[in-house]
Amino acid sequence: MNILLVYKEADIATYKMLEGLSKLEDFNIYIASPPIVYRTKKIYGNCTPLDLPVITSKFNWNVIRALREIIKTYRIDLIYSPSSSGLSNALFASIGTRAKNIAYRGTQAKLKRFDPTYYLGILNPAVEHVVCETKDIEEYLSRFIARKRLTTSTKPFDIDWIKEAVRTPKQADDIPDDAFRCIYIGATKNRPFKGLTDLIHAFILLDDPRVHLTIVGEYGENDFQLAQQSKVSAQIHFLGQRSDAISFLVTSQLFILPSHRDASPRVVREAMACSVPCIVTDIPGARDLIIDGVTGLLVPPSSPQKMAASIRSLIDNPERLEAFAKASREHIIQDFSVKAYTDGFATLFRSIKKA
């Protein structure tokens, strides 16, 4: 079976899945991407890299022409396109060929049935199957797409992916050695749905000199001023965008996700892999990553009061916090296996090929 990945740049979970498939006798894996992608990154397993012009839009003639040549030359059976622009170009390129198109949906953004642009991609009848990141996304898409054409496959996480961060732990300046260290990682500038304002209000309500919060990621001026003008300003540390963000997780005792909506944030997996318990808002997708009362706690979104109370409950119960930390890492190892993720795709691809 000949599988083609079409993407500007896939994440490590997708590459690792393809690596696993490439080692199976019945799979030949081809990765079509701009040369700069695979020349600066390791190509995993027995995957074959193929040149593709940069995808700049949902209809790019040079990309379509190159993809069509690849489809014919390598007798492609299935095309997996994790990005919307890649999917649209692949759909055009595969017209009149035997190649079947498989899409990926990792966002909870709403679809518009009467918006023609969606029929260039995920709502196109030529899309054979859609892989959904979460059950909530699958449930929503079932309003538009037959359930038999939908599958949920949540991305895995391997603890090996945090080895470098573990080797190089970091901590914000001016945090006392005996402080209780909380952390949030995320880009929140112009994204109020990320809930950073709620998290800052929770710390103001908490008003505990023992507790410090490190915020990593691009932030808005309003949130910065809210923290700076509060009585806990010395306990909230804004680091901005950092390429080494995970290294700050390693030295933290609690990760907090205050989002109002967020599909399946990778950072929660990273925290658990680092043995850091999580407080997560009870929202679709994100809530499925933790086990409430075992690896962390769920709190209602937009509720600084409940968030503050949950933080305090873990500060005051170090034994429970330690149990959460241990269970978090075990949860990642047991329930977010790359092998299980790969096996799921192998089964899916085989069934689509036979259909």
Where are the model-predicted features located?
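Glycosyltransferase donor-sugar binding loop
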Residues: A32-V37, I185-K189, H212-F224
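A conserved mid-protein helix/loop that constitutes part of the nucleotide-sugar donor-binding site
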Residues: I12-E19, N190-L205, R269, Q305
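Short His-centered aromatic/hydrophobic patch
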Residues: S81-L87, R105
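A short, well-ordered alpha-helix in the C-terminal region of glycosyltransferases
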Residues: K306, S313, R320-D335, Y341-T347
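Conserved acidic donor-binding segment of nucleotide-sugar-dependent glycosyltransferases
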Residues: D292-G293, L297-P304, S313-E319
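Aromatic "clamp/platform" in nucleotide-sugar-dependent glycosyltransferases that forms part
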Residues: Q241, H260
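Conserved donor-binding/catalytic core segment of Leloir-type glycosyltransferases
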Residues: L4-V6, D174-K194, I200-F203
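Short hydrophobic beta-strand element within catalytic cores of glycosyltransferases
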Residues: P277-V280
